[in-house]
């Protein structure tokens, strides 16, 4: 380990409009890049994740054995030291990391940033510790990324920071370099379009989940206690490994190709999972509560076995893209544990998998599972030029394995509405000038006279 003594603190780094749960501050950045020890990833150590074809593969994962403080360049101070370690994976559009031993001490600060210093994530500190002792990060732009760790010297003995996997993004998943702009004008509407105006709450329930070098879509889901437990439901074939969840990854205009501010969280536990060949669902839970600043909506659901009809919408991250909406369903049918139907506007494609469709009551009825067509080019164009049916795993078929979590009060209800704040919706006339105005109503039911 290279040790350098230095007295000054230099520049603060700029950030892009993104946040993982982090705790402020900026990297020390008190070293010349040329002084940092860089580790080049051995691409022969690739992990074969054997992803399902409905999972969008955006990255290769490589197995590593990296004890960060042992291999880092150290800047030693009288009371605290800062460690810098560079990770290089040639050709990557972005890099992400999985730490299989992650236990930061009380006064530790961890940042991760690109060599060009155009973005950083962090700080991470002891509040990011979790019972699993692991952490997966969001992607950071560049194929050369720096890990910076500042820790009081007396706390070093208690630190655990070991990296086991490097995720090499070859697709430019988050469009840092503009490589995917052409793909973003597909046949699904942006959720900022007027077609999504009546579905704003449901839009805010849908998230993107990355793990194992692939991405799927999913939904934050409510439970009968209305207690804002951070449950997420998606497809069994998406589940596995360390996950990072992306919130609000969506355009701010109907024709926009790039997102506004978005947020991420990492660290999940699997609560219930089916066999994707006959019951394709998985219920997971984030290790931490979702911050109120993320504006999340906890979607309602229905376990009814009756047909939802054709007035349904799907909301999803098709091709790992900014959030989209599909609508005008036709041919609604039932086949075992699946609902089968097509969309007149929009298509489910890899990356959409696990996403919810909502019935006319704006409740989840199923999770995207498969498509009745051949898998083709990574570009959405080849899917948009076809007309085909989609298979959604029935929410009702998963119920017997998820009811302990989604009905913790044993109400045995068949459906509930969603919530933002833990309060149940009260339906009535919300027009204060109407003769039957209900001052307690939170949702207008169309009854105003």
Predicted regions and their residues:
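Bacterial Sec-dependent N-terminal signal peptides
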Residues: 1-24
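Primarily marks secretory-pathway-exposed extracellular/lumenal segments that are disulfide-
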Residues: 14-19, 416-449
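A short aromatic-anchored loop/beta-hairpin motif
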Residues: 20-88, 168-187, 192
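Short, surface-exposed beta-strand/strand-loop-strand elements in extracellular ectodomains
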Residues: 103-118
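Beta-sandwich interaction modules
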Residues: 116-146, 150-155
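Serine endopeptidase catalytic core focused on the charge-relay Asp
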Residues: 140-215, 219-341
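Catalytic nucleophile loop of clan PA
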Residues: 219-229, 346-368
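C-terminal subregion of chymotrypsin/trypsin-like serine protease catalytic domains
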Residues: 232, 258-265, 274, 358-425
